[in-house]
Amino acid sequence: MTDLLSRAHADALDAADPLRSLRDAFVFPQHGDRDQTYLVGNSLGLQPRAARAMVDEVLDQWGTLGVEGHFTGPTQWLTYHQLVRDALARVVGAQPGEVVAMNTLSVNLHLMMASFYRPTHERGAILIEAGAFPSDRHAVESQLRLRGLDPATHLIEVEADEPNGTLSMAAIADAIAQHGPRLALVLWPGIQYRTGQAFDLAEIVRLARAQGAAVGCDLAHAVGNIPLTLHDDGVDFAVWCNYKYLNAGPGAVGGCFVHERHANSDLPRIAGWWGHEQQTRFRMDPQFVPSPGAEGWQLSNPPVLALAPLRASLTLFDQAGMAALRAKSERLTGHLEQLIRARVPQVLQIVTPAEPMRRGCQLSLRVAGGRAQGRSLFEHLHAAGVLGDWREPDVIRIAPVPLYNRFSDLHTFVGQVEAWAAA
C-alpha cells in the first residue's frame, strides 16, 4: 500500500502532472548545484524563459526603427498594451474592454478612488478589513484627507472574528449592514495578504450595492492565483500588481479593471493624454475625449519594455488555463497542509482557512515559540535553499505555485522544518 504522504508518492504525482512541462518554461535561482525550492511566487514570480526574447524584440525594434516603432514593426508600441489585454481579461473574468495594464497598484488605486469614491455629507465612509496591506490603508487615508475628511471617523475597519485572525462572511455582512447608510465605498482584497484568506467577492458586492456603496478590490494576491469573475460579480473597479503570480518581473506594470457599466460614464477622473480616444489622440486637441472602458483611465504611454515579460507569462496562462491551474493548486496546497498536520503539527500552526474555497495557493504559518523561533526557522530554510517569505510580526508564507512548483518541493520544505526542529 502506497504511503500517500511519502516522497515516492509525491514523485509519482509529479510524474503524472499534466502541467509538469510548464516548469521548464521558467528560470530558477540556483542553490549550489540545484534549483532553489522556490515557494515564494506570492511575493515575486519566477522569470518566464520567453521574457528575455520578448524584451529583446522590443529592444531590437527600438534600435532598428527608433521612434517609428510606435507605428510600424512586428509589434507597434502604440497598441502594445493591447497585446496583453485579452489574456488579462481571461485571467480576471472580464470583458476585454474592462481591463488595462498600466502604472502600478497603488497609483491605480488612487486613480480609481478619484473616480469611484464620491463622498456626500451623509455617505462618506470607506470600509476595509483590519490589517489591510499598508499601501491600501495609506491610499485610503490620504484620499480621505484630500477631501477634508478625518480617517478616525470615516475609515471603518472590520476586525477579524475567527481564531487565527481570519474573517467570517457573517462579520463582513454585519459591518456592511451596520454602516450601510454611511458607506460610499467598500474596498476589499480578493485574498488577504497576511493570512492567505480568500473572500466571496460576489457576495460582498451584492451586500454593498444593496446599501448603495461602490465596491473596489485589491487583487494583488488573487490575480493568477484563484479564478476570478469580476464582470459577473459586478465589481466597480479592481487593481492589482503583475509581479507575483503573473510573473511580470520586479516592479512590473500593474493592472486595472473598470466594469463595462462605467465604460462611457461621465465619472470624474484624473486624465492624461494616453487615456484620450485613440483615433484622435495625436490631433493634440485640448478637449479630453476618454477612450471607452478601462483604457480611458490611462495617463501616459505604456512602458513597453515592462509589458514584454507580462506578455510572455500570459502566454503560459493561456496554454494551461485557469481551471487546470486552480485544480493543481488545490491539490498542491492540500498536500502541503496534510504534510504539515502529519509531520510537524507541534512546530507549525496553519493560519490560512482549511476550506479550499477560502484560500488560494498560499499557506500562512506561525511557528511555535513565537517570533524569535519563527525567524530562526525562516533563516534556516533560506540557508537550505528553501524560499518562503516573512511577514511581521510572526508569519511565514509558503506558496506552491501550480505553474512551476512540484509536490516534491513540499516534501523538501517539510523535511527542512523537521531538520530545524531536531537541531
From Swiss-Prot:
Kindly list the cofactors needed. Answer: pyridoxal 5'-phosphate
Specify the enzyme's EC class, one word. Answer: hydrolase
List GO BP terms, alphabetically: anthranilate metabolic process; L-kynurenine catabolic process; L-tryptophan catabolic process to kynurenine; NAD biosynthetic process; quinolinate biosynthetic process
Cellular component aspect of the GO annotation: cytoplasm
Q: Name one GO molecular function term.
A: pyridoxal phosphate binding
Identify the residues that bind pyridoxal 5'-phosphate: 105-106, 133-136, 218, 221, 243, 273, 301
UniProt keyword list = Hydrolase, Pyridine nucleotide biosynthesis, Pyridoxal phosphate
In terms of Pfam families, this protein maps to: KYNU_C
- Residues with N6-(pyridoxal phosphate)lysine modification: 244
Could you say which protein family the record assigns here?
A: Belongs to the kynureninase family.
Instruction: State the protein's name.
Output: Kynureninase
List the source organism.
Answer: Xanthomonas oryzae pv. oryzae (strain PXO99A)
GN (gene name) = kynU
